[in-house]
């Protein structure tokens, strides 16, 4: 009986653990993640609505817009 009770308690606790993907809010058309700090493989793009950083992988970062030179 105690094993059954322990099993039920374990199921209840594990049922409340959030999945890893829902830990961060998504940004930049779903490609980035809102975090306090960006990892070394990511760059900061803009601020998320909650004032955290929108971190985007370097592989997904759009190329810079070329500046026009006036002669």
Curated annotation (Swiss-Prot):
Subcellular location, record wording: Secreted
Source taxon at top rank? Eukaryota
Tell me the leader sequence span.
1-22
KW Secreted (keyword) present: yes
Q: Please, one GO biological process term?
A: defense response to bacterium
Transcription in keyword set: no
**InterPro entries, alphabetized:** Beta_defensin_dom
Disulfide-bonded cysteines: 27-54, 34-48, 38-55
UniProt keywords, alphabetically: Antibiotic, Antimicrobial, Defensin, Disulfide bond, Secreted, Signal
Question: Mainly localized where?
Answer: secreted
What GO cellular component term, any one, is given?
extracellular region
Similarity-based family: Belongs to the beta-defensin family.
Q: What does this protein do?
A: Has antibacterial activity.
**Name used for this protein in its record:** Beta-defensin 124
> Organism, per UniProt?
Pan troglodytes (Chimpanzee)
């Amino acid at each position: 009986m105690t094993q059954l009770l322990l099993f039920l308690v374990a199921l209840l606790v594990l049922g409340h653990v959030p999945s890893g993907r829902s830990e961060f809010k998504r940004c930049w058309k779903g490609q980035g993640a809102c975090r306090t700090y960006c990892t070394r493989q990511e760059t900061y793009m803009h601020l998320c609505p909650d004032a955290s950083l929108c971190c985007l992988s370097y592989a997904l970062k759009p190329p810079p817009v070329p500046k026009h030179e006036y002669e």
